Design a protein with these regions (language model features):
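Short loop->beta transition adjacent to catalytic acidic/histidine clusters or analogous donor-positioning motifs
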Residues: 32, 56-64
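Short beta-strand-to-loop acidic/aromatic patch adjacent to the donor-nucleotide binding site
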Residues: 130-141
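Juxtamembrane luminal stem/stalk of type II transmembrane Golgi/ER carbohydrate-processing enzymes
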Residues: 1-28
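Catalytic core and acceptor-binding pocket of nucleotide-sugar-dependent glycosyltransferases
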Residues: 142, 182-284
Length: 284
C-alpha cells in the first residue's frame, strides 16, 4: 500500500501510522530472563528493580552490567551474575543530529552497538536461553506478570515515529534503504520498547542476520544520530528477523501518565523514586 506521511509517501505492507497493531488475545509470559544493560551509579534503584522482578518472576535469572559505574558484585548469587564493563552511555549523550557523523562520534556509536550485541549474548547464555528476555534499566519497575499479544515477538508502546521531523524521516529512509538490501527484513518506522521484552530465538535470528550482513548494516550509524540506543537498536534487530514491535497496553511511563501509581500496568518505565542526583550519566 502507498502511505502518505506529511510531505512524503512510502510503500509498505502495513500502515505505520497505526500505533496499536496488536491482537486482542493475550498469553502470559512465564519463562523469562532479565538483562540489565547499563546500571551506572543507581545503587538503590537497581536493588529495587531487581527485588521487584524477583517478586514476580522468582525463578528467573538476571545478568547485570555496570558500564563504568559502581561494583554490584555483592548482589551475585546463583541466579544473578554481575559484569563490570566500560561506560558506553556517557559519550553518547553528547551526540546529536549536528555532530553524529563526526569520526569520533561514529566510533562511539559503533562501540555502543557492539557492546549491546555482546551483552545480549552474554546475558542470554547466563539466563540459559529462556523463551523470553527483558533488556532493561534501573528505571523500570516490573510489578506484575507480563502478557503478550498472540503472535507478537517484540513488545513495546511504539510511541516514537520516524516522521516526527524531516531529519528523522530522512534518517529512517536511510535505515530502511539498508534493511531493504537484505532478504526477509521489514521496514521500521515506529518504536519505543523500554524495557525491551522479546522472544529469544527471534532475537538470535536477528543478530545472526546482522552479523552476516555487517558490511551493509555497519552503515546504520551514518543514517541517524542514535541508532544504537537499545530501545531502537533491538527493534532494528527484530526487523531484520521480519518481526515488528507490537503495541503492548501493559506498558506505561511515569512522565506521560500522572496516574501510573494507581494504574494496572505491570510494566512501568521512568520510575525514578529511588534515584539520587548523582545517579545519572555524564561527568559526575
Amino acid at each position: 500500500m502507498i502511505i502518505d506521511l506529511g510531505n512524503h509517501t512510502i510503500e509498505c505492507d502495513f500502515d505505520p501510522r497505526i500505533q496499536c497493531n496488536n491482537s486482542a488475545e493475550k498469553l502470559p509470559i512465564e519463562d523469562i530472563g532479565f538483562i540489565y544493560n547499563c546500571v551506572f551509579k543507581q545503587r538503590s534503584a537497581t536493588r529495587r528493580s531487581i527485588e521487584a522482578t524477583r517478586e514476580v518472576y522468582p525463578e528467573a535469572k538476571r545478568y547485570l552490567v555496570s558500564d563504568g559505574g559502581l561494583d554490584y558484585s555483592f548482589l551475585e548469587d546463583e541466579r544473578l551474575k554481575f559484569s563490570m564493563q566500560e561506560d558506553t552511555v556517557s559519550p553518547i549523550i553528547k551526540i546529536n543530529e549536528s555532530n553524529f557523523l563526526d569520526p569520533i562520534n561514529q566510533v562511539v556509536t559503533k562501540r555502543g552497538m557492539a557492546a549491546t550485541i555482546r551483552r545480549l549474548k552474554e546475558g542470554l547464555e547466563f539466563c540459559e536461553y529462556p523463551e523470553w528476555f527483558c533488556m532493561t534499566e534501573p528505571d523500570v519497575l516490573i510489578r506484575g506478570k507480563v502478557n503478550y499479544p498472540v503472535g507478537a515477538k517484540l513488545l513495546g508502546h511504539r510511541v516514537n515515529f520516524a516522521w516526527y521531523t524531516k531529519s528523522w524521516y530522512d534518517g529512517f529512509i536511510g535505515i530502511n534503504n539498508l534493511l531493504s538490501q537484505i532478504e526477509g527484513t521489514i521496514p521500521i518506522l515506529r518504536w519505543g520498547s523500554v524495557p525491551v521484552i522479546g522472544h529469544t530465538q527471534t532475537l538470535l535470528k536477528g543478530i545472526e542476520v546482522y552479523e552476516k550482513n555487517f558490511d551493509i548494516l555497519d552503515k546504520l550509524s551514518e543514517q541517524f544520530h542514535v541508532p544504537g540506543t537499545f530501545d531502537l537498536f533491538l527493534p532494528i534487530l527484530f526487523a531484520l528477523a521480519g518481526e515488528p514491535e507490537v503495541f503492548s497496553d501493559e506498558y506505561t511511563e511515569c512522565l506521560r501518565n500522572p496516574n501510573w501509581k494507581t494504574s494496572s500496568h505491570p510494566v512501568v518505565h521512568q520510575y525514578r523514586e529511588f534515584y539520587s542526583n548523582n545517579d545519572y550519566y555524564g561527568d559526575n
